């Protein structure tokens, strides 16, 4: 889950000037000075908040102490984090979806997710499987909508694991549709027209029957 952020609006290179300049910008190295702290507090910024600390951490990682920032730039960056200091996804406005080195392994767990989300994924997977003749078309798929709908139903701490779980169910459904298409026409290959009615007997319950999401893999090159 890569993310590119332009911090040009936060920084300006300036050499041979004082720590706080005439237009209200200040060197990042001066953030903890009493004068800058007074400016921040006067602007309504809680410098003890996790939101502020997350923003400053990001600023410092993107620049260095000799670079400049300003009050509005800090406020703008703070708006990218929630009160717990967690990054807010700009696409869906939800926190708890940033994959880091710390949570990379812990997110890979199967948890209970709403049946409505599984049903939504089943229906979409079937629709797109038929429309694209089994091909995964990244240009036309609406998978992201299903995942975002799921994330809104989950608590922040469970969103990554919920997405991981739904991905496993998606694989189960695709495998079931592939197997059904092959059963209806043993000569069928991905990208070729699927025999009419080939998937009619594949219900969500049947696809999930006897399948463990934790072990879901694709046996085919779908």
Annotated model-derived regions:
Residues 1-222:
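Type III/flagellar secretion export determinants
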């Amino acid at each position: 889950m890569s993310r590119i952020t332009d911090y040009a609006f936060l920084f300006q290179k300036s050499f041979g000037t004082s720590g706080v300049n005439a237009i209200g910008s200040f060197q990042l190295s001066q953030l903890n000075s009493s004068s800058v702290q007074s400016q921040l507090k006067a602007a309504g910024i809680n410098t003890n908040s996790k939101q502020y600390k997350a923003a400053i951490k990001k600023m410092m990682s993107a620049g260095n102490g000799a670079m400049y920032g300003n009050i509005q730039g800090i406020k703008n960056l703070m708006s990218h984090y929630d009160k717990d200091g967690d990054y807010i996804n700009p696409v869906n406005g939800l926190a708890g979806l940033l994959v880091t080195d710390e949570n990379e392994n812990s997110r890979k767990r199967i948890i209970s997710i709403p049946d409505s989300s599984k049903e939504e994924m089943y229906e979409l997977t079937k629709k797109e499987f038929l429309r694209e003749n089994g091909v995964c078309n990244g240009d036309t798929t609406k998978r992201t909508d299903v995942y975002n709908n799921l994330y809104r139903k989950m608590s922040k701490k469970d969103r990554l694991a919920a997405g991981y779980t739904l991905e496993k169910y998606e694989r189960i459904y695709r495998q079931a549709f592939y197997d059904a298409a092959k059963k209806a026409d043993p000569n069928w290959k991905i990208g070729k027209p699927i025999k009419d009615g080939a998937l009619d007997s594949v219900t969500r319950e049947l696809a999930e029957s006897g399948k463990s999401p934790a072990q879901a893999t694709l046996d085919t090159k779908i």
